Swiss-Prot record:
Part of the 50S ribosomal subunit; part of the 5S rRNA/L5/L18/L25 subcomplex. Contacts the 5S rRNA. Binds to the 5S rRNA independently of L5 and L18. NCBIfam families: bL25_bact_ctc, PRK05618.1-4. InterPro entries: Rbsml_bL25/Gln-tRNA_synth_N, Ribosomal_bL25/Gln-tRNA_synth, Ribosomal_bL25_b-dom, Ribosomal_bL25_C, Ribosomal_bL25_long, Ribosomal_L25_dom, Ribosomal_uL5_bac-type. It comes from Campylobacter lari (strain RM2100 / D67 / ATCC BAA-1060). One of its GO terms (molecular function) is 5S rRNA binding. GO terms for biological process: translation. Keywords: Ribonucleoprotein, Ribosomal protein, RNA-binding, rRNA-binding. One of its GO terms (cellular component) is cytosolic large ribosomal subunit. Transmembrane segments: none annotated. This is Large ribosomal subunit protein bL25. This is one of the proteins that binds to the 5S RNA in the ribosome where it forms part of the central protuberance. The keyword Ribonucleoprotein applies.
Amino acid sequence: MLEGIVRESIGRKAAKALKRDGYLIANIYGKGLENINAAFKINEFIKEVRKKTTLAFDVKVGGKVLNVVVVDYQKDPVTAELKHVDLKVAQKGVISKYMVPVKIVGTAMGLKNKGVLIQSKRRLKVKCAAENLPNYFELDVTKLDVGDALLVRDVVVPEGVTMVDADRVAVVGVEKAR
């Protein structure tokens, strides 16, 4: 389990000092909860996020164990080093909005007909309780030919989950190569 510290000071000076010591600055928030300004060892955070098998994972901050989901992160544009991360507490029974990744399976038929596979949405916004949160949406693109696309309405959504994105938006498609 990932362990972090609660930041006493939230100023820029304190944040810079923590970053120099190898910490990643994080904000943890949730519906009806007080925001927690935390810091995690950057290498431990990256290891934990890479090895997680579900969208939500446990962190321990200030003696509390919280089940969180990565909402947003900021990277340095030059070094690609993580600078900041926002974590949302996934509370059981509380309906909230989450971004769920899209996994593409198969090879599109249109790729053999001089087409190019274009994934326009890498994550889809859903509204659900934490216990119904899917880890990812799997899309089979084997039947896609040049000019075809899979829309948000074509995604199979589990029970208890509602799609927030507009249903006419393309998720993945095959276009003619120029």
